[in-house]
Amino acid sequence: MWSGPPQQDEGLPVGLSAISVPWKNLGPSKGNRKSPGGLVEASASWEEAGGEEHPAAAPLDVSRLRSSSMEIREKGSEFLKEELYKAQKELKLKDEECERLCKVRAQLEQELEELTASLFEEAHKMVREANMKQAASEKQLKEAWGKIDMLQAEVTALKTLVITSTPASPNRELHPQLLSPTKAGPRKGHSRQKSTSSLCPVVCPTAGHIPTPDKEGKEVDTTLFAEFQAWRASPTLDKNCPFLERVYREDVGPCLDFTVQELSALVRTAVEDNTLTIEPVASQTLPNVECNNTNTCALSGLARTCHHRIRLGDSDGHYYISPSSRARITAVCNFFTYVRYIQQGLVRQDAEPMFWEIMRLRKGMSLAKLGFFPQEA
């Protein structure tokens, strides 16, 4: 800015010598320069506009403009700073929110992965357990079918045995057809005698054999048959029912009534519980506890050659018995075996054939009690 005093030789007015006009405001561009006459006109316009103002008013206006522009600039700067701070704060909050959401998403993804893994593991576990149960069920089914086949075979064999009415240990005296031809006994026939007195119609039986008639007359006892039918309607092994009570009183009790009463009671209990075992002496090779010698019957106390011995339940003790005692025990066992078959529903016959089989077994007990028994080979 140029503020030097104008020269006097240019003919400028004296009042303009104290005014300093900025070069910028007068348009000092090269193309707009004017003659001193233009300056006079400009100064005149300043005088008309300012009147009698103080010569220092123009610099004050410039300073005011400068201060106001600085204030505006400072306020704008503060406003921008505030807006920037707000924007930064909002951005920080958004960043924190984004970070939190990222953590939540990562946690959810981890939980989802763990849940998927646990579900697959549980599914595999359930499938494995199901396969194991299926395998066990199939194994049990095979075992059950095997047991069923075995039981069916046993039932078929028992039915065949019962239908033929032959007990497990038949009394050969009551079944002469089981004896060998040489021991079957005499047959009915005629023989010439040197004596002319008469003809003997029947050959006399050999000693030790019972004559077996070809035909026997049979008649049903109504009282016994009524008791049997009442028992057959509801089979039981309770010896207090009328049917079994009579058999116990008339056949089982006397047949198992031996001289040694204490051992007789034990034998009777073992027969009723189906826990008595009869063993041949020759087939035993292992040493066991012997309760008597082989030349004395443990039940009768008589000196007899004993080819069998009995064992009561799970006891290790054995008792040698004579052939007569064995026949009596066997007869009672045959009766109880048939009665158990009826109770288990294995006998499919009418009432009368079953009744006569019971009577035949009772007859075997009576004969054994009376001392009749088959001779051993």
UniProtKB/Swiss-Prot annotation:
Quaternary structure, from the entry: Interacts with RAB3A and IHPK1 through the coiled-coil domain. This interaction is competitive. IHPK1 kinase activity is not required for this interaction.
Alphabetical keyword list: Coiled coil, Guanine-nucleotide releasing factor, Phosphoprotein, Protein transport, Transport
InterPro entries: RAB3IL/RAB3IP/Sec2, Sec2_N
Biological process terms in GO annotation: protein transport
Annotated segments matching region Disordered: 23-57, 167-198
Stored Gene3D superfamilies: 1.20.5.4880
Protein name: Guanine nucleotide exchange factor for Rab-3A
SUPFAM superfamilies: Sec2 N-terminal region (SSF144284)
Coiled coil: 77-128
Family: Belongs to the SEC2 family.
Known function: Guanine nucleotide exchange factor (GEF) which may activate RAB3A, a GTPase that regulates synaptic vesicle exocytosis. Promotes the exchange of GDP to GTP, converting inactive GDP-bound Rab proteins into their active GTP-bound form. May also activate RAB8A and RAB8B.
Location of Phosphoserine modifications: 169, 180
Transmembrane segments: none
Domain of life: Eukaryota
Tissue: Selectively localized to the brain (at protein level).
A GO molecular function held by the record: identical protein binding
Gene from which the chain derives: Rab3il1
Transmembrane recorded as keyword: no
